[in-house]
């Protein structure tokens, strides 16, 4: 007998269970397992996956939602993911499939906008290959001259930031339009207003979290797991805990292409050396008169050190840096292994006993001779 099926999007993964937003049968997410044959072939299921689901009898018979917060889930209430459709994009950190864009959120102030941190986020976002939407929050706390300064500065970097204020909802409509009908990831440092922005973009987000997590965890808004939330005008949005402390997991030769202003310089021309890393090599196509060139050099050293950790270790000077009560740093000699280690009393007694025994043996041998 052919089982009834529907297609949908995986919106959350928790242990061995998957929440799927179905397209036709119900407007509520359905709790599912993964078919054994998918496990056997090593087919993983990720948030954002497009899947085909075998529907549970209870849903077909009663037409009810499967997300009521009950303490146990009966076998007949579970759907089963039977197929995972090919993915258009895949991210490992955070683990999300089929994402289309990353929305980076920063604050213009409180905390102050820090150019190195912003640059690092942008570089890692570029490495995903996804479209980037840059959003500056807290417009209501700065002067118009500050807004213009950062707008002009980011334009030179190759970006057109969306300026918003969650507090007075200024500029939010433009961001909503960018998110419409797409799977988007939201990332950024702490304290910039991401949670408040998500609450504004996704009305009832706390209830969505409660529904999705009612059977499996306590039902509070946490970003330890990636979850997709429905946007009112279409599309899905995820907060991304794995992206909020970005690593530069790129190849050295790839790094220059993650800076739009440098990428533009390489359009239609090449460096003389194929392995050029754009550090002043002869006939390099990339100039040095762009603002983030220093960022590029610093990030490049970090990437090179990751590839050759044995070469990046500094020679041991025998000193270690410590911070005093006055906040000043100072060097203190390291204690060499075993050289300055105090012997334990037990060890001293053992050595003394061994010495006495050896002395007695020597004396005994002398008496015998």
Curated annotation (Swiss-Prot):
GN (gene name): rsgA
Subunit structure: Monomer. Associates with 30S ribosomal subunit, binds 16S rRNA.
NCBIfam families: PRK12289.1, ribosome small subunit-dependent GTPase A
Alphabetized SUPFAM superfamilies for the sequence: Nucleic acid-binding proteins, P-loop containing nucleoside triphosphate hydrolases
Positions annotated to bind Zn(2+): 271, 276, 278, 284
Subcellular location: Cytoplasm
UniProt protein name: Small ribosomal subunit biogenesis GTPase RsgA
Binding site for GTP: 137-140, 188-196
Gene Ontology CC terms, in alphabetical order: cytoplasm
Family named by the database record: Belongs to the TRAFAC class YlqF/YawG GTPase family. RsgA subfamily.
């Amino acid at each position: 007998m052919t089982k009834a099926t529907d297609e949908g999007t995986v919106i959350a993964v928790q242990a061995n269970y998957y929440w799927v937003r179905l397209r036709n049968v119900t407007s509520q997410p359905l709790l599912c397992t993964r078919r054994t044959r998918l496990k056997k072939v090593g087919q993983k299921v990720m948030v954002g996956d497009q899947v085909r689901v075998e529907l549970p009898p209870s849903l077909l018979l009663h037409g009810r939602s499967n997300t009521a917060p009950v303490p146990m889930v009966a076998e007949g209430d579970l759907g089963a993911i039977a197929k995972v459709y090919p993915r258009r994009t895949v991210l490992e950190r955070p683990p999300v499939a089929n994402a289309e864009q990353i929305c980076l959120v920063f604050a213009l102030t409180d905390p102050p906008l820090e150019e190195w941190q912003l640059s690092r986020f942008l570089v890692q976002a570029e490495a995903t290959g996804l479209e980037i939407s840059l959003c500056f929050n807290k417009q209501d706390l700065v002067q118009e001259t500050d807004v213009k300064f950062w707008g002009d500065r980011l334009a030179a970097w190759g970006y057109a930031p969306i300026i918003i204020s969650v507090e007075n909802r200024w500029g939010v409509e433009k961001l909503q339009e960018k998110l419409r009908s797409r799977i988007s990831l939201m990332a950024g440092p702490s304290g910039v207003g991401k949670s408040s922005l998500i609450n504004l973009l996704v009305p009832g987000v706390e209830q969505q979290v409660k529904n999705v997590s009612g059977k499996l965890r306590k039902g509070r808004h946490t970003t330890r797991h990636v979850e997709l939330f429905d946007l009112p005008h279409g599309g899905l949005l995820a907060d991304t805990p794995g992206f909020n402390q970005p690593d530069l997991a790129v190849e050295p030769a790839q790094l220059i292409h993650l800076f739009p202003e440098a990428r533009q310089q390489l359009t239609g021309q090449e460096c003389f050396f194929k392995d050029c890393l754009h550090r002043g090599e002869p006939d390099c196509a990339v100039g040095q008169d762009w603002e983030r060139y220093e960022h590029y050099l610093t990030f490049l050293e970090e990437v090179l050190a990751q590839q050759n950790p044995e070469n990046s270790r500094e020679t041991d000077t025998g000193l270690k840096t410590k911070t005093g009560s006055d906040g000043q740093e100072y060097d203190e000699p390291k204690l060499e292994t075993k050289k300055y280690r105090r012997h334990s009393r037990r060890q001293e007694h053992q050595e003394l006993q061994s010495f006495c025994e050896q002395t007695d043996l020597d004396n005994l041998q002398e008496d015998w001779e």
